[in-house]
């Protein structure tokens, strides 16, 4: 074939398979491929155009298309090929190539029909063909295509083999599918057939089985009855045997002894036969009767008493011949009697009668032979007659002897036999009649007995099958439970290994991240590292420069969810951890650069900024103190500044966890000063702190860095809106001249105004007291994480407070990418480190070491005793107090009302409501320990007052001073007529209604009055009535005035008169006669001359005063006046008032009640005007300061009223803590100390204020209710005013950030659950600036819940020491605490020592039995209902605590 013919007729020359076949499914191997590669079967790649077709295409592109009509021969050949192609095939062509489909054939572009060529194009093609034909060698015929042809054949074979293989796989798949479907169909049919068969035959089978079971049960009972009968037979026969042997031993006659021995032998044979039947050996005969003979119901016979044996007549051969009765021996007769008795006893017991067994034919034959022999022997021989006289005499003598001896004897025997026979017949008749009646009586009874037996049988059968089914069910459940437990154990082991690999991956990832950060910093400084990051399984050594190279940024990053933690080989996990760590470092650096470049798309948050490098390995670059910082940094503070600067330059977040009081604030301020001075970065900086420290931050920034401007962002919503105008603006450039550089605000305000803070790109965000974000689920944590900031710095003195979960929250906040949503890491922090629930202690120690390696790089912590030598020591003392009687009664009553066992069982269930109830109980016990008045205050008591008090609608309109004098009046009023109360009822009072008042006044009051001056004068001149006036030093006018004065006015006048006579009598000490002669006009003034009050006034000391005031001095000396009155009246009432319709009595009563002179005389209260006049006129105040006429009350406590006010002394002694605190404060006050007094409850602070007021101690107070603007002034007052002795604070509000170095004593009235909260509170005084030793007193009530809480707090402190300080874990018993036992531990706090010991003993016994003590059936369901894990700290501070 020539090349021209190929070009002229490509369609005709192309073979049908080539035209119909699709392009090959596999890519042809290159020319240099090996035979192994050629023969390898691979999945078919996308189709491609063969090289030959490609050449044809190229030629078609070069040559114009020409249409050449095929010749007739070619046309015929094409038709044959078309017919062959149109025949149906089985999918395989002749050359072994799969037949192409229609769609595949139509997809080839070069098989499409060609267009018609022009004549010029046809001529050109023909010329070219002629040239090709005339050439020396054709391209087709010339060699050079052998290799392509071989390759083509190889591809065809490979396609054929592949097609065959695919068809085989498809056939196998179809066969498997068909078999599966067929199996399912057959299974359905079989199941349906089984159901039909069960439905059809289930009832019959059940009935048949039940019938068989009933029959089996009957047979079993019959066997049991037969067995009991045989055992009874053995017992009776054994008794008979023993009795026979005993009789044989006692018998004297040999025949009788032989008889008894035969009976014993017979009984032995029967015993042997019965035992053989019991043992299962088939006896030749059934033992069914007592004797081998049948029972004789007719009685005994006398045939045995014949002298001679008469042979019975032989039976005739005929069936109906007469039968003679055989003779019976004594043994047979006795046997018949015994049989009769046995039959009678059987009938009495309703037992079946024993029937005599049939004798063997052999025995019958033997009996017959014996009878025949006896008959033969008994026939006597004929005797010859012999008669003699002696014979006859002997014969007669014999008959006489017979008649005398034998006949009576025989008669007696015969009569006895007859009577015996009659008696037996009578008994037999009675038995027969009784038995006949029994059949009639037993008809219904037997039916009832049958029913009862059937019911009892059914019950027994049901109980048996139920018991059997229960046992089988228990065994099946036990097997299933064991199988499930083994499967759970295996699954738990697999899951534990998987979790361990997850944890190793996470820890290795963080360790490698820390290692890469350290290498990069050291590489930048030109210092080769020599430290190693040690893990539990591998050790990463820096080594050579090409190891762990950071330039390998193209390493594949694997998601945590895509990792295979089930594989045993951990090489892939280590490689993935290394790649992820490298990628995290690169992302952190890129984001830091992007933030500095101001790219908007990277301004969201640098969540990948992490740092795990130890501050000592961050390099040896020494950074000097900024010049704009006015304070002088200490050495350790300068080191902290270097660490913070390196963190910022690398874009890494960190935790500054120095102990409280070492200057975390000044170090943070120095970082901002460094950035402003060196890098010209003036902000904006964001400082978030607790509300109590906001003023402190503002003051210290202004004080130490005056060039940095602070914007205090707090106040009301309106104030904050005005402040936002300074910073809530776009495109603000922060320079030295900016309006502000640092914004200081609180956590609460950040959450409220989070939408405004998120708009600003903060250069540095500093969180003071970062334990405020210890919960990663809180809105505060999420809002702060969403802020756009370049770096974050957390300041905290206590990174671990209650548990390790809080430390993990801080780590999650500063590096959320590596730790985000990793529950395994969280569980490791909160479970394995804190509780060590696993038994593998070595694994826990390795994890603890790796935790230290993770914490060291990015957390800097220094302790005071290591860095600050000039700071005074801190001494902690636990002061134990005892419960008072009232506290002990309250505590015992509370504990008796609570069941400790019930609480522990509820704690094992773990319901949230039960946990809250338990915490409320703990709060009640703590209240009792603090002060019983927290439950019930001692109220003010007073008698029931039957009176009416003044009322007012509002005190506002009453003014500043409300006058309520004499506002109390009796509810009883005595009404009087107007005539009596008015002037009309008075005789001497003139008025419109009294026309005779002048007459009566003139005559009655003057003329007829004996005290008239004229009458007194006339009577005193001689020895009249008033002649004594000259001896009593009284004039006429004085007597007249006293007659017109009342008794009260006379007493007041007598009180104002000086006691001159008695004083003179005391001073001169003269005789009475001499004094009387010296002063005759006072002769009759005996009382004034001998008044003892003058002696008391003159002699103020010495024995004379004691002798004159014996009663008063004894009363005062014994303290009777200060004793509280033991009895108070039940009711009290003011005097009954008089009422009238007239106003006259009201005016008169007011004149009497509000008389100034009377009130002054009674109470001796001089007015301000009188005191001013005495001072101005320089008068002697003694006459104007006379003692009150109203005597002093006997009781100083009660005074003039019966109102009982609670005693403050009792208030102090009712609480053991307060009594101990009273002694302690007295000593501290005398020593010149100043005290910080911390409380957990604000109500206790209220009570403490009353106590301090009672003791006159000056104090100030700060708790959660103190306003923000007042806190700064309160702290400043305590710091600047030394007279303030006590500062009352709540541990939560007053324990954060404030500086109280003026105090050198800290007292915790009640301790916090969290020991770090107390540590923060005591460091308010023990911090920089404190030059004295700080003493910390902690009041603990002995033997109560507070002592157990303190022990738990010490364990928490040990956890912090182990994790943060890197100490050994030997001091903490981690194995005794897990997540489920926290609530149970709280319940154990409520128990006393005896109850706790009993509960621990029961727990030990439960563990020995393999049970869980206190667990109930609903425990798992209740545990699943818990929505969240409530910590002790959260539940404790929900109940009336000081709010932070």
From Swiss-Prot:
The lineage of its organism: Eukaryota, Fungi, Dikarya, Ascomycota, Pezizomycotina. Residues 1220-1380 form the Helicase C-terminal domain. Residues 55-85, 329-340, 357-377, 438-452 have a biased composition (Basic and acidic residues). Residues 207-283, 440-511 form a coiled coil. Its main location: nucleus. The keyword Amino-acid biosynthesis does not apply. Keywords: Activator, ATP-binding, Coiled coil, DNA damage, DNA repair, DNA-binding, Hydrolase, Nucleotide-binding, Nucleus, Transcription, Transcription regulation. This is Chromatin-remodeling ATPase INO80. PANTHER family: CHROMATIN-REMODELING ATPASE INO80, HELICASE SRCAP-RELATED.
């Amino acid at each position: 074939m020539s090349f021209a013919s190929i070009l002229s007729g490509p369609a005709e020359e192309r073979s049908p398979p080539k035209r119909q076949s699709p392009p090959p499914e596999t890519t042809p191997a290159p020319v240099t491929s090996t035979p192994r590669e050629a023969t390898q079967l691979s999945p078919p790649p996308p189709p491609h155009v063969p090289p030959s077709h490609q050449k044809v295409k190229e030629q078609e592109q070069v040559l114009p298309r020409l249409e050449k009509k095929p010749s007739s021969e070619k046309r015929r050949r094409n038709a044959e090929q078309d017919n062959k192609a149109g025949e149906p095939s089985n999918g395989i062509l002749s050359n072994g190539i799969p037949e192409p489909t229609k769609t595949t054939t139509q997809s080839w572009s070069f098989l499409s029909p060609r267009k018609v060529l022009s004549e010029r194009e046809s001529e050109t093609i023909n010329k070219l063909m002629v040239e090709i034909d005339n050439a020396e060698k054709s391209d087709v015929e010339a060699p050079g295509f052998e290799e392509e042809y071989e390759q083509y054949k190889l591809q065809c074979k490979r396609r054929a083999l592949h097609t065959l293989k695919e068809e085989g796989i498809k056939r196998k798949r179809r066969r498997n599918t068909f078999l599966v479907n067929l199996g399912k169909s057959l299974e359905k049919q079989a199941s349906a057939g089984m159901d039909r068969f069960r439905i059809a035959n289930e009832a019959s089978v059940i009935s048949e089985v039940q019938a068989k079971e009933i029959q089996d049960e009957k047979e079993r009972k019959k066997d049991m009855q037969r067995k009991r009968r045989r055992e009874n037979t053995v017992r009776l026969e054994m008794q008979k045997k023993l009795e026979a042997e005993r009789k044989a031993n006692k018998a004297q006659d040999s025949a009788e002894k032989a008889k008894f021995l035969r009976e014993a032998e017979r009984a032995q044979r029967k015993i042997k036969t019965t035992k053989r039947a019991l043992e299962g050996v088939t006896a030749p005969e059934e033992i069914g009767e007592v004797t081998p003979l049948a029972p004789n119901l007719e009685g005994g016979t006398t045939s045995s008493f014949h002298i001679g044996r008469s042979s019975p007549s032989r039976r005739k051969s005929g069936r109906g011949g007469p039968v003679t009765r055989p003779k019976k021996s004594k043994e047979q007769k006795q046997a018949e009697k015994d049989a009769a008795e046995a039959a009678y006893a059987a009938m009495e017991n309703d037992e079946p009668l024993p029937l005599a067994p049939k004798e063997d034919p052999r025995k019958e034959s033997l009996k017959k032979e014996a009878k025949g022999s006896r008959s033969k022997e008994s026939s006597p021989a004929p005797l010859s007659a012999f008669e003699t006289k002696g014979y006859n005499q002997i014969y007669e003598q014999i008959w006489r002897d017979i008649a005398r001896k034998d006949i009576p004897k025989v008669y007696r025997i015969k009569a006895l036999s007859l009577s015996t026979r009659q008696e037996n017949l009578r008994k037999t008749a009675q038995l027969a009649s009784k038995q006949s009646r029994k059949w009639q009586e037993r008809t219904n009874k037997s039916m009832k007995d049958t029913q009862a037996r059937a019911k009892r049988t059914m019950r027994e059968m049901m109980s048996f099958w139920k018991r059997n089914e229960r046992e089988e069910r228990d065994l099946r459940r036990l097997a299933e439970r064991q199988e499930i437990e083994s499967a759970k154990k295996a699954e738990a082991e697999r899951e534990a290994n998987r979790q361990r690999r997850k944890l190793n991956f996470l820890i290795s990832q963080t360790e490698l991240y820390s290692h890469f950060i350290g290498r990069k910093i050291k590489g930048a400084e030109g210092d080769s590292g020599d430290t190693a990051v040690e893990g539990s399984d591998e050790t990463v050594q820096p080594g050579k420069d090409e190891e762990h190279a950071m330039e390998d940024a193209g390493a594949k990053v694997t998601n945590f969810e895509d990792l295979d933690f089930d594989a045993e080989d951990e090489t892939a996990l280590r490689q993935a951890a290394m790649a992820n760590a490298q990628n995290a470092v690169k992302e952190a650096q890129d984001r830091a650069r992007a933030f500095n470049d101001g790219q908007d798309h990277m301004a969201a948050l640098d969540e990948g900024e992490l740092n795990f490098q130890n501050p000592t390995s961050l390099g040896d670059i020494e950074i000097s103190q900024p010049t704009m910082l006015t304070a002088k940094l200490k050495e350790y503070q300068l080191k902290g500044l270097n660490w913070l600067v390196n963190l910022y330059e690398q874009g890494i977040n960190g935790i500054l966890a120095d102990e409280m009081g070492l200057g975390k604030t000044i170090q943070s301020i120095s970082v901002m000063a460094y950035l402003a001075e060196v890098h010209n970065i003036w902000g904006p900086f964001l400082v978030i702190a607790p509300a109590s420290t906001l003023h402190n931050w503002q003051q210290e920034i202004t004080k130490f860095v005056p060039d940095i401007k602070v914007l205090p962002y707090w106040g009301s919503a309106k104030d904050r809106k005005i402040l936002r105008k300074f910073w809530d603006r776009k495109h603000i450039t922060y320079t030295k001249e900016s309006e502000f550089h640092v914004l200081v605000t609180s956590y609460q305000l950040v959450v409220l105004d989070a939408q405004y803070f998120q708009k600003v790109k903060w250069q540095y965000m500093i969180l003071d007291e970062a334990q405020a974000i210890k919960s990663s689920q809180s809105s505060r944590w999420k809002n702060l994480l969403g802020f756009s900031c370049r770096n974050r710095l957390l300041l905290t003195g206590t990174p671990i407070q209650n548990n390790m979960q809080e430390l993990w929250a801080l780590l999650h906040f500063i590096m959320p990418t590596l730790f985000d949503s990793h529950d395994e890491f969280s569980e490791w922090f909160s479970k394995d480190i804190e509780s060590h629930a696993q038994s593998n202690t070595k694994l826990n120690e390795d994890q603890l070491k790796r935790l230290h390696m993770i914490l060291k790089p990015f957390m800097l912590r220094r302790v005071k005793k290591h860095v600050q030598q000039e700071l005074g020591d801190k001494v902690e003392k636990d002061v134990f107090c005892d419960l008072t009687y009232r506290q002990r009664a309250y505590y015992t009553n509370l504990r008796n009302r609570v069941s400790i066992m019930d609480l522990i069982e509820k704690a094992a269930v773990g319901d949230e409501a039960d946990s809250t109830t338990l915490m409320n109980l703990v709060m009640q016990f703590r209240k009792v320990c603090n002060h019983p008045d927290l439950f019930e205050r001692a109220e003010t008591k007073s008698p029931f007052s039957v009176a009416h008090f003044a009322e007012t609608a509002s005190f506002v309109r009453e003014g500043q001073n409300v006058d309520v004098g004499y506002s109390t009046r009796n509810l009883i009023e005595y009404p009087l007529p107007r005539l009596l109360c008015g002037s009309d009822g008075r005789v001497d009072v003139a008025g419109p209604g009294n026309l005779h008042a002048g007459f009566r006044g003139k005559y009655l009051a003057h003329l007829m009055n004996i005290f008239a001056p004229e009458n007194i004068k006339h009577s005193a001149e001689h020895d009249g009535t008033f002649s004594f006036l000259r001896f009593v030093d009284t004039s006429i006018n004085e007597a007249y005035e006293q007659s017109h004065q009342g008794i009260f006015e006379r007493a007041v006048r007598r009180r104002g008169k000086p006691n001159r006579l008695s004083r003179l009598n005391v001073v001169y000490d003269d005789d009475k006669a001499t004094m009387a002669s010296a002063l005759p006009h006072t002769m009759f003034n005996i009382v004034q001359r001998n008044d003892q009050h003058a002696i008391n006034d003159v002699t103020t000391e010495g024995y004379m005063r004691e002798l004159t005031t014996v009663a008063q001095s004894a009363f005062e000396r014994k303290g009777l006046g200060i004793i509280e009155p033991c009895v108070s009246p039940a009711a009290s009432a003011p005097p009954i008032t008089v009422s009238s319709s007239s106003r006259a009595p009201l005016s008169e009563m007011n004149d009497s009640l509000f008389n100034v002179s009377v009130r002054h005389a009674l109470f001796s209260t001089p007015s301000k005007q009188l005191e001013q006049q005495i001072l101005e006129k320089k008068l002697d105040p003694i006459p104007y300061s006379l003692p009150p006429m109203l005597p002093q009350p006997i009781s100083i406590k009660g005074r003039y009223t019966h109102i009982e006010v609670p005693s403050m002394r009792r208030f102090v002694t009712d609480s053991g803590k307060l009594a101990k605190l009273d002694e302690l404060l007295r000593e501290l006050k005398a020593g010149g100390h100043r005290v910080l007094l911390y409380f957990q409850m604000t109500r206790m602070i209220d009570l403490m204020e009353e106590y301090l007021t009672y003791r006159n101690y000056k104090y100030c107070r700060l708790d959660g209710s103190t306003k923000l603007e007042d806190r700064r002034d309160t702290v400043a007052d305590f710091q600047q005013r030394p007279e303030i002795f006590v500062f009352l604070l709540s541990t939560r509000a007053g324990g954060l950030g404030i500086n109280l170095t003026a105090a050198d004593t800290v007292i915790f009235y009640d301790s916090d659950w969290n020991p770090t909260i107390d540590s923060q509170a005591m460091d308010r005084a023990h911090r920089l600036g404190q030059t004295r030793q700080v003493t910390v007193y902690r009041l603990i009530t002995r033997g109560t819940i507070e002592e157990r809480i303190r022990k738990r707090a010490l364990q928490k402190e040990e956890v912090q020491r182990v994790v943060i300080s890197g100490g050994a874990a030997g001091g903490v018993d981690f194995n005794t605490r897990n997540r489920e036992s926290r609530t149970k531990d709280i319940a154990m706090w409520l128990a006393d020592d005896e109850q706790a010991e009993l509960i621990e003993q029961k727990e030990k016994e439960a563990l020995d039995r393999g049970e869980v003590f206190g667990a109930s059936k609903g425990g798992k369901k209740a545990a699943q209902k818990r929505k969240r894990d409530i910590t002790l700290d959260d539940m404790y501070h929900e109940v009336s605590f000081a709010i932070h």
